[in-house]
Amino acid sequence: IFGVRAKKKLLMQIIVASLLPMSYLYINNLYGFLGIYEIPPLVGAVLTVGVLVFIMNAINLIDGIDGLSASLTLIALAGLFFIFQRERIWVYCILIAGLMGVLIPFLYHNIWGKQEKNQKIFMGDSGSLTLGYILGVLLIKFCMYNPHVMPYQKGATLLSVTLLLVPTFDVFRVIIVRILHQKPIFRADKNHIHHKLMRAGMTQHQALISIIALSLIFIIINLSLFNQ
């Protein structure tokens, strides 16, 4: 999104994120995460907006090399698809399957497409923010306790964090480093995990595979332990 300042982007993100609690879709239970269970609606609404804005920016900020943002989103969607199909919530399964079907050909052209043959496509801010928004909505839907839709999911909050563990920790680390060095939080830099791996000698594809493998390991372990 060219020509739009970071603060204006953030304001628009807050506005669109506010649509969720206005539609009565918000985080109302942390399932024991940090010792917290049921939370008041007002607190849940504010938390929902904050979480959704964070996820949108996490997916956007980690989009630094070809295929990374889309790959991590695809992995998280696969985890959510497993959860929703297990609970037989087919509406969300259809949404996830459709989005995964879009991402797979995109990844092919984004990673292996030849720019000189006009075969390479890019995501940009609009694409990564949209992916982050949809992914955030699905995660919040999973975290919201509604006994009429889904039974009590012990560990739902922790599993949701795991699905986006790599972009979550990467954003936290980058923000902390920028604050410590008194740099603007919204200014782009080359301090993300993929930049670190490439400076260590990896190629773009090696860094991509390493980050995907790390994310997959955490997600598979937590999914196998979920509700056991």
Annotated model-derived regions:
Residues I1-V91, G101-G113, I212-N222, N227-Q228:
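Intramembrane alpha-helical segments
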